[in-house]
């Protein structure tokens, strides 16, 4: 064989060796299940909203950018829409029983933040008191919050919010 053929063969071997090692390493790593992946995505989306809402800092920390064609509505409807839609989607998952898995720990943390967020949403003294009236959009957004109670109906934690539920009911009645 000619010297150039040996060089090509050596080059191919050098290039393929790291690929083989990477493939072997990948097999050793734990494969993430679809559930783990989506629970992680859910936590990443919900944690910034719920942690801030529970501390009364959502409206302070969530910057709202308006379109040049904004129709002039009060931009505070954004916070109610954000919290309401998030909770409507999250409530069934938060209703699952606690466990010691990574998902269960994240779920428990989100539930704790969410329960405090509900309280702040209806507390007129909270910086995160939501805009319940003054705008037609609030009726739609309030419906998402109400839906979260329906979708999380079997949750012991949500049932503990009886006074907050009454406050939410009172606020919904003020929507336009």
What positions do the PLM features span?
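Ser/Thr/Asn(+Pro)-rich, low-complexity disordered segments
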Residues: 23-176
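Bacterial Sec-dependent N-terminal signal peptides
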Residues: 1-27
């Amino acid at each position: 064989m000619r010297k150039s053929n040996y060089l090509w063969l050596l080059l191919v071997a050098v290039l393929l060796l790291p690929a083989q090692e990477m493939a072997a390493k990948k097999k050793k790593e734990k494969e993430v299940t679809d559930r783990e992946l989506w629970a992680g995505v859910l936590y990443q989306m919900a944690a910034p909203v719920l942690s801030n809402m529970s501390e009364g800092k959502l409206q302070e920390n969530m910057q709202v950018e308006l379109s040049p064609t904004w129709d002039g509505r009060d931009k505070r409807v954004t916070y109610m829409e954000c919290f309401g839609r998030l909770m409507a989607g999250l409530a069934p998952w938060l209703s699952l029983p606690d466990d010691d898995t990574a998902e269960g720990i994240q779920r428990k943390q989100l539930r704790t933040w969410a329960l405090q967020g509900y309280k702040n949403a209806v507390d007129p003294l909270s910086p995160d008191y939501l805009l319940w009236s003054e705008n037609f959009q609030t009726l739609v957004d309030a419906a998402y919050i109400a839906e979260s109670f329906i979708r999380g109906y079997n949750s012991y934690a949500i049932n503990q919010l009886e006074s907050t539920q009454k406050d939410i009911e009172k606020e919904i009645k003020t929507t336009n």
